[in-house]
Amino acid sequence: MPIANCQLPIVNYQFLSLRIMPAIKVAILDLYEGHPNQGMRCIREILNQYGESNHLDLAWDEFDVRLKKEVPDMSYDIFISSGGPGSPLESEGSEWEKAYFHWLQQVIKWNNDPANLKKKHVFFICHSFQLACRHLKIGKVTKRKSTAFGVFPVHMLIEGQDEVTFEGLNDPFYAVDSRDYQVVQPHHNRLRDLGGKVLCIEKDRPHVPFERAIMAIRFTDYMIGTQFHPEADAIGMSLHLQTEERKKVVIESHGYDKWESMIEHLNDPDKILWTYSHILPNFLDHAQHEIQG
């Protein structure tokens, strides 16, 4: 019996062109000079969480700026420059600072070149923020009358309300602050030349005859910095402050009431946890969308 002729149905296959995204390279510039700190841990955790929640191939390297004079090259897409101990004034002229400012000038040069379509995005934290302000002549870096340590309200200016990095924040929002130095007297003409603006200031205290510190600046379209610590992790920092050793240090330096108020603020979901979950993730969002087009 002959086998019947079978005609296979014609199937039209549509092949989807899959766009393979390259890894986003992040450089963390460590300015802690080997001192024990929570900042680096917090930055790593934010990058881990951000990469996982957004299904991104996020790779990073760390550079010991002050001890080893290490700085990244221009193969990185995003730079996060940490806080650190000591005076942002006394390091002037040091070898590590020369290397750091050379890196910063390379970033600015790259971003100013129209041929470079993918720009480099930078976030400066605390000590790095003060160094950038001094180097770029954005404002006056001075020693405070007393140490700022604790959880404080940060007040947005009009420019800050339109800042993509602050999207979703209240006004004021709360941040961890730990510093002996501050940036005051912004040079507005210099900021305008760079395309920058002051975004936030510290709490208004009309009864105190001191200048209010600048708490955040957008330096250029691709560089932003904060005086406070947006990377501060409420849960991790709360546990850290409740260890016997750290509790003793804080109480001896700042008093029991300050320690107790920090624990209370850290456990408030509308304060540090809210800031932690918005500022650096917003910065990474904005940067990676621009990088990947």
What kind of feature is each model-predicted range?
Residues 21, 71-75, 116-117, 168-170, ...:
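Flexible, charged surface loops at secondary-structure boundaries
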Residues 137-235:
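Pocket-forming structural segment of enzyme catalytic cores
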Residues 1-2, 7-9:
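Short polybasic linear motifs
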Residues 86-160:
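Cysteine-nucleophile active-site neighborhood
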Residues 23-25, 121, 174:
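Residues that mark the start of a beta-strand
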